[in-house]
Amino acid sequence: MLELRSVTAGYDRRAPVVRGMGLTIEAGGSVGLLGPSGCGKSTLARVAALLHRPYAGEVVLDGVPVAGWRHHAPRAQRTAIGVVFQQPRLSADPRLRIADIIAEPLRATGRGADARSRTEELAQAVGLGGDLLGRRPHEVSDGQLQRACVARALVLRPRLLICDEMTAMLDASTTAALVGVVEEYRARSGAALLAVGHDRVLLERWCERTVAWPDLTAPSPR
């Protein structure tokens, strides 16, 4: 499903935060990436999500090497991945209503005709009442906004979900609810999961396999 091969990445070529990392996620599998804050795991997650071009190495999705990043990535690869970040207020457009945040990927890919029905379906799945869909981010809580961001990540029915510290800002009940939403989707769709975090207990309960950050320096299995 996803292979990261000897990836080196960062924000300064002279001091990359990710050096020669490898990771494999099988189709339908779930991997937890465990590491302390600042180690580079979120940068690696952005590479895996095709949002950050590495300096070196290769990303292979469904057996096809990735040749472009961000909006330059082929649509078939770009839309195969759904991403949820740690801070919803940094990843949601504050000008949009909650319903439009959820539907944003549909409209961006020319599928706006499905927006209303799909938004209502996913809002119910993540526990957002209909009265919240007309509000803007500043009118809802962090937990409610993160629910919307999870719905947005699922709206194109991705084959791979990347959850980068998705629950770090949430209370225990919201964490359990959103992990449940992700796992219900995976059970229905067969999607794979990369969950990134620093909470070993959560990752080991959530994922089939948990990999600690230093262990990624070893070559990824082929």
Identify what each model region corresponds to.
Residues G57-G68:
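Conserved ABC transporter NBD signature motif
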Residues D114-D131:
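Conserved ABC ATPase "signature" region
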Residues A49:
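Helix-to-loop junction immediately C-terminal to a conserved catalytic motif
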Residues R157:
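Conserved catalytic motifs of ABC-family nucleotide-binding domains
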Residues R136-V140, Q144:
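Conserved ABC ATPase signature
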Residues V150:
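Hydrophobic anchor residue at the start of the ABC signature
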Residues V66-G82, L96, D100, A108:
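ABC ATPase NBD coupling module
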